[in-house]
Amino acid sequence: METTVKKQKKNLETKKPSIYSLQLHEMQDWLKEQGEPKFRAGQIFDWLYKKRVKNYEDMSNLAKGLRDKLSNSFDITTLNTLVKQTSSDGTIKFLFQLYDGYSIETVLMRHEYGNSICVTTQVGCRIGCTFCASTLGGLKRNLEAGEIVAQVVEVQRALDETEERVSSLVVMGIGEPFDNYDNLMSFLRIVNHEKGIHIGARHMTVSTSGIVPKIYKFAEEDMQINFAISLHAANTEIRSKLMPINRAYKLPDLMEAVKYYVNRTGRRITFEYGLFGGENDQVEHAEELAALLKGVKCHVNLIPVNYVPERDYVRTPREQIFLFEKTLKDRGVNVTIRREQGHDIDAACGQLRAKERKEETR
């Protein structure tokens, strides 16, 4: 019998590129190289993203020769579901295993306006935010575009059973999306394309901890994707404590990049602000935040943080959250408190993966 380690080594040795990593024009280019008509790309995408088949033999309108070429050249990436947790509010958290044995998290959230999915872009994270479970263990590797796409496909397969669909997505799972920029953009274009999963650009949101050079680059992209900054503090001292990335990309430089993005795109930006008891949740912190954002076309999303056992932070009391919100509103800031979901499962980003890793080391 093969051990898990041997299977993983075998997978690494035999791995082919993921077909989910190809954008439509890249599929057309590959078909041309194979002497095949480029219209076949649309048929292949239909099988992958509309019918969601798991093997090439099911692509019945393709000649066997083409199916064999596809099979010899590309893997249809499938993710092994290790854990599936369902919350009382309908939130579902998936722990998926990748071909090399690493695991990642994906979350399905149910809203009145539809189903939203939160995807992961890296195995682990290098950013080191002191409140986050995702960074425990550091960064292992970037996900390929196809591995990010496969998360959406797998969740959509789960929704097929109840004839539902993924209608929006947020790139706010494990990892820093802008540290995996090229694969991130390929993923977004694949899921946005009408022949792909076809999620509208305005129904997608990318969040960053503040990689300043990539904010300027993202401002030049030709997609109207929503953009969010994980801010969590409006002064340098507190933000550097919560988010060490602030030492590399200072708050004034971050705000300059934000203003460039807003002016270049005309789009409103969202600032995510997690409230940590006794750290950044007092009235004076709200006043600092309002001053920092004055004149910026933005929205603030206040986040009552989920408890992470490996971290020391505590939740801000409910009445303090409302006072913080009121302080911002009184100063003209557009603000909402994020609705809590998945509170009765391992809801914090990276928490389920950290729990699984801990079990494996026992």
Swiss-Prot record:
One GO CC term, this protein: cytoplasm
Domain Radical SAM core: 111-344
Molecular-function annotations in GO: 4 iron, 4 sulfur cluster binding; metal ion binding; rRNA (adenine(2503)-C2-)-methyltransferase activity; rRNA binding; tRNA (adenine(37)-C2)-methyltransferase activity; tRNA binding
Pfam family, one: RlmN_N
Gene3D superfamilies: 1.10.150.530, Aldolase class I (3.20.20.70)
GO biological process, one term: tRNA methylation
Positions with a binding annotation for [4Fe-4S] cluster: 125, 129, 132
PANTHER family with a match to the protein in the record: 23S RRNA METHYLTRANSFERASE (PTHR30544), RADICAL SAM CORE DOMAIN-CONTAINING PROTEIN (PTHR30544:SF5)
Described function: Specifically methylates position 2 of adenine 2503 in 23S rRNA and position 2 of adenine 37 in tRNAs.
Record-given protein name: Probable dual-specificity RNA methyltransferase RlmN
Lineage of the species this protein comes from: Bacteria, Bacillati, Bacillota, Bacilli, Bacillales
